[in-house]
Every structure is written in structure tokens, then in C-alpha cells.
Amino acid sequence: MTNRISRLKTALFSNTREISLERALLYTASHRQTEGEPVILRRAKATAYILEHVEISIRDEELIAGNRTVKPRAGIMSPEMDPYWLLKELDQFPTRPQDRFAISEEDKRIYREELFPYWEKRSMKDFINGQMTDEVKAATSTQIFSINQTDKGQGHIIIDYPRLLNHGLGELVAQMQQHCQQQPENHFYQAALLLLEASQKHILRYAELAETMAANCTDAQRREELLTIAEISRHNAEHKPQTFWQACQLFWYMNIILQYESNASSLSLGRFDQYMLPFYQASLTQGEDPAFLKELLESLWVKCNDIVLLRSTSSARYFAGFPTGYTALLDGLTENGRSAVNVLSFLCLDAYQSVQLPQPNLGVRTNALIDTPFLMKTAETIRLGTGIPQIFNDEVVVPAFLNRGVSLEDARDYSVVGCVELSIPGRTYGLHDIAMFNLLKVMEICLHENEGNAALTYEGLLEQIRAKISHYITLMVEGSNICDIGHRDWAPVPLLSSFISDCLEKGRDITDGGARYNFSGVQGIGIANLSDSLHALKGMVFEQQRLSFDELLSVLKANFATPEGEKVRARLINRFEKYGNDIDEVDNISAELLRHYCKEVEKYQNPRGGYFTPGSYTVSAHVPLGSVVGATPDGRFAGEQLADGGLSPMLGQDAQGPTAVLKSVSKLDNTLLSNGTLLNVKFTPATLEGEAGLRKLADFLRAFTQLKLQHIQFNVVNADTLREAQQRPQDYAGLVVRVAGYSAFFVELSKEIQDDIIRRTAHQL
């Protein structure tokens, strides 16, 4: 890492995070002037107004220009989506447990007196709340499931970066002008053209700023850099990039612009090493210094950490630590099925090893053809302990997409949005994180409904759980589809849609079914706890008959605080096998019930003509979802977290080592889980030391691939180090750990999430 990159890193995190009202004020100012116009045009005009008037900056020593806010890592508001939680939490932002932000008293006053009164009763949240039935509201209030993305832009998508970079904005504007001429009444085309032209003007503002700064700069080297930024910006406003610097700059400008349009999470990066390779090679051919090109890439990686998301207190518990979702996958397959590793794949990991920040959320695609040197480079990067890169298995994911009707060529081109959500870049609107389903809460409801049922059998209970899962899935689908319609009718994204295949051919926004592939992704959470609980209950009550069902239920209701409660809990924990130890009897319960969940989910259609797709990952939702579930037959206390990750074993229950964990997860139908899965594994640093440690990790990754698991990620850290960081956070400000599908600064996580990471089983190989 160069001195420049070190200073850029330091500067990014040297100030307190603040809330900026600038986007909200500009958006509102435009919106006041467009009453009565079509929603998609109002949205486009508001975004264009932001691009014209928002304050811009180029920070000291930056090689890549473009900042969403002048101050680093500032949160921005989108009251047009949901003004109510913002009003409620204005005074809580600086002191809340997770994701704190400073906000001035003047900004609070402006929000209360100007922004909230305008958006009250005219936001997307008002529409969604007005459509939700009482039954759906009751289920979400008890957290049987959650409906997400009701308060902000949807995101969770990858635009067609090759189209942007290989054609350039000038050509794209010309194409959109033709569409407008052919269909002059089409509001989508009008909105997209308006925003493409506004993007050009916004980029030219940076060119002018760089020229002004250069004229006043006394340092010769920095003056030349600023003039180059100006030249690149003027070129990118009209023409396609020719060099790596130009490509990186246009790539980042578009990321910033899309943030203004929707303020959404997980506007992910796709297969960066594939579409950026021609520009990197062109720069090498032109004689550019490889060391400088690496510094450019490191600059871009640092920039990815400048965007943080302002979430509600509740949402921050589900998505703790700013998982912005700048996810990029490396390697994988070419369109003809060969290994896709290239020189830029290596450079992306090298640059990450230098910066070691939470974003970008890099991943590596493995398969039977994976290049051994690149596998070793991957293992070397994992060993650093930041949880990056995560690993995805082509041997599972490609068939999973084929099973959903995706073409073979498109399936081989898959990438990931957000944490682990599977998507086809530039062709999919997957609504990937629309809902989370609390499987353990459903079991708890069934247990309580059977109190006093002397005729209850294990098979009868299992059938009731299946039926109840099916029932609540119908409600989850109902709520998800209402949210889907809310985004269509209140929050279209015409600029983003112009970079998604088939939207231009159809003349429709992605929210209106314009994309080639239209999914709605929902996550089943708690399968490990569910199977552990049912296995223990079956043994304790129905086979060994040590307690009656009502006696066990009484102990659970008391949270094990009965005269025999601790003995009962010890037996439940220690005498009955747990998922994650390669024991068929309990693993098969997981497999059967998760398959039931998947098959039920995939029955349903969304308003865009696509189907629901199941996944199993938690982000950090295993903590809040566990908080609403009482004590359970796996020995879990009331309110205790669920198993992390999605497919990970419960904390402390994976006693037979990491290979046994792989074997347990391999018994699940990973192919059905086409919205993504998540498996966390924690290693002690000592087990990966030296060349031998790297080879052991590489072999473990090959075993993961051969066993046909879909996803795996790692923490490589000592629990003692994490405990020290809790006590002395000022000494561990740069400590990055894996949470669930993303990495975060350990000291920026709430204590409950920190404790969760500390408690995860640390394995040895």
C-alpha cells in the first residue's frame, strides 16, 4: 500500500459520521414543482435536480473523483420512501446501539418543520401500510417474517457495466433519443433520457471543479493529477473509456449517480475482473506503470467504503455494520464453460490485501477447473482474517439457475448482490432481500397450540409445522407483493433500468417487469435450531418419554427456571445430536423441512411475472429474530439468538470439526436455494500458519467444491483478540471481521453482534 492510499484510508475514517439532508431537500424542492406529472418523470426530474445542484468535492490526493456527500461516510435521507421512522429517531441517531450518526439541531428542525410535513401521507410507506392486511401486519409485528425494503430504495441489483463501459454515455444517450423518437409517449424512455443527459452534466461538473482546483494548486504533481481527472471526466461525459483510469472513473461516477437516484443498498459490482480486463490490458499496452494501476485499484477499493446506509434502529439490527453491498465476484466460468481467472483477478486480491477494508465485499467463484495459483492466492487473502473473499460454488449455482429457467450462457455469468444473493448481472431484477422467514417462531407457535393435546404424536406435530410454514409463506408472499407494487407505483428507477437487459426493448422500468429475469427472493432462517429442537423433542418426549409434552412445554415457558429446568436443559443440549456434526438423523430433519420451505416458496408469482425464489442467509437478523422466540427444545434460552449465517450450526454445537460441518450442509438441497445461502466457519489463526496452513485451507476449499455446497466464508481470529477490542475499541479501529455475508469493523458493531462473533466455534484443520 502506497503512502497515498494509507492517507486516504485514514482520512476516510477520521471524522464522526453525520447525517446529510442535502439529497432530501433537493429531491423535495423538485417534487414540489411537478405535482400532477407521471411518477416516473417526477422521480427522474428530482434526481436530475440533485445531480445539477448537489455540492461536489474532490478530496486531497484522490485519484478517483466522485463523492455522494462532501463529508466522508455521511448518511443520506430518502423521506419520499418513509418519513415516519426518520421523525421518530431524530434524537436517537447519535446514541443508538448500532450504526450511530451525528445530526445537528438545525437539521432536526428542518426535518420536523419542512421535510416531514411535506412527505407525511404521500410516501411509499403510506401506500404499503394502507394495503397490508391485518393478518400480514400481525405476522410481521410478531416477527414470524419481516418485509424488507419498505423504507428505502430496493437496490440488490447489478447493472450492465459492460454496456456502460463499452459504449459510453454519449452513445447511450443517442440510443435513448431514438427510442424516444420511435415512442414519444413512453414515459420510461423520456425519464431514462433525462437522467442519462443529467449524468453527463454531473460528470462535467467534476471536470470543471478539477480544473478550478488545479488552477489554485501549488503542488506540481497534484496539479497534473487534477488536470488528468478533468480530462478523464470530460472524455467520460461523452465517450467510452479507453484506459483503466478512465474506466474506473466512469464506473465510480455511475455508482454515485445511482445512489442519488434511489439511496439503495447493494448496487453491486458484478464480475469486475471480467469486464475491466480489456481496459487494464489497454493501459499496460500503452506503457502505463503496473504499480500505478494497482494504486488506482486500491483507490477505488477505498472509495467503496465512503458510502454507508442510514437505516432505522430496527433495520440496523438486521443489517448491522453498514453492509453496503459493493459485492464483486472474481474468477468463475467463461461463456463456453472454461476457467475465467485472469491477471486482474489476482490484482483485485492483491489490492484488497493492501487496503483490508469491509468494502468491496469480494467473492471468488470456485469450480472443478479453478486455477491452483489463484486458489492459493484466495487462501492467502482469507488468512488475513477480514472474512474476505467469500466463496461461491459454480458446481451448485449454475444448476440452480438452470432450474429457475435461466439460459446456460446467462447462468455461467452469474454474480452476487448484497451479501450472498445470486443474480445474473445486467439481466435480473430479483428483489433479493424482500423478506425473512423465522422458521423457529413457526415451531414455537405450533408447540403452544398443542398444549393439552394428549393425542399429539411427533409425526402429527411435524405435519402441523409444515402446514403452518405453508400458511405463513402465503402471508409473506402477500406482503412482499404489496411492497413490490409499492416500488413500481412510487419508486421507479429509470436510470438504473436503462442498464438492465430487456427494459429498453420492452420500454418498461425494472419495477414494472422490464428485466429479463424477475424473481422475489425470501430467506428461511433458523433451520439449525428447528432441526436440533425437533430431534431433541422427539427423543425426550416421544421416544425416551422422560417428560410429557406438556411438562417440557412448561419448562420452556419458564425459560428453564424450574426446579428441574437446568437438568432438562443439560439433557436437551448434551444427550441429543445436533446439526453440523455429520449425523444423518438430525441433518435429515434440516434437509426435509428446508426442502418443504423451498418448494412452498417457489409456487408463488410476483407482480412482474416472475417467481419467488428461496434462500437461507441471515445478515445479522439471527439476533433480532431470536429475541422474539422463547426457550426451545434445543436448549436455547428465551430471546437468545438463532444460528448465524443461514446454514451454519448453532453456536458451540459443531463439535466434530469443520469437515463434519461441510458434510451436514451438503445433505441440504443447495440447488433449490437459488436466492443464496450462507455458511460461516471460524478458524484459529494458528491452524492456517505457514505454507502448510495455506495448503490445508486450499484443500478444504476443494472439499467444499466437491461436496457441492453453495457458499462458505471465514473468520480467522482469536476470541481473545475480539474481547480485547471490546475493552479497548480505540486500539482496534481497523479490525475487520465477518458478520454474515459481509464484513464490518468490529468496533462499529453492537455488543450483541460482537458477542455472537466471539461465541462462534473456532475450528482447526
Regions found by a protein language model. Give the residues of each.
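Extended non-globular scaffold/tether segments
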Residues: 190-201
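Conserved catalytic cores of very large enzyme subunits
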Residues: 2-189, 225-228, 232-765
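Extended amphipathic alpha-helical scaffold segments
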Residues: 203-211, 273-277
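A conserved hydrophobic secondary-structure block that centers on an alpha-helix together
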Residues: 214-221
